[in-house]
Amino acid sequence: MRRLVTAVVTAALATGVLAGCGSGDNWAKKCTTKDTVVECAPDRRTPIKQDVKGQLLDGTAYDLAGDKGKVVVVNFWGSWCAPCRAEADDLEKTYQETQAKGVAFLGIDSRDDKDAAKAFARGRATYPSIYDFDGKVAQQFDVTQVATPQTLIIDRQGRIAYAIRGATVYTQLLPMVQKVAAEAHPTAPPTALKSTKGSS
């Protein structure tokens, strides 16, 4: 009976939405929403907090600041989530194809049993995941709603470029990640114009 009650409570929390987690000025209002995708043009992006920290499933510490200057793809998931299982291979495939281009992936596992989460990630994802049972780490990202699954693409300046509200697939995710990764690095010097002086 106790297990049944725990399962019901966990499922209720899992399917719920964390509301009011971001700032009062919702960054998404400045962006374009089409279906389940929010796209923010570079001049419309809002920086997220850079002190996002948590403990990974293997027990080691993670700090978002360690990925500064990279494009970071953040996926919110749970082992209890059927759409999360469906998108897992597509996320891993995208990660493998983009990590050499300065792209990092991070999973946020919420409302989950830790052993079940480890079993889910094993063989599915080679990138790290934070264990976030109570959703506190998810709240550190400036989003007013965190449903599961959901994927954020954060640019090299620490701003949300895309939010995919729901499951994603390789053919959708890869072009988005590539587009953000191709943007000029914030510390890159301006390209010098080739002089045409003295040319005939």
Where is each model-derived feature located?
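N-terminal targeting signals for export/organelle localization
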Residues: 1-53, 183-200
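Residue-level recognition of short loop/turn positions
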Residues: 58-60, 157
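Conserved hydrophobic packing residues within short motifs/helices of P-loop NTPase cores
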Residues: 74, 106-108, 152
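Structural microenvironment flanking redox-active thiols in thiol-disulfide oxidoreductases
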Residues: 85-124, 133-140
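Thiol/disulfide oxidoreductase modules built on the thioredoxin-like
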Residues: 119-126, 132-200
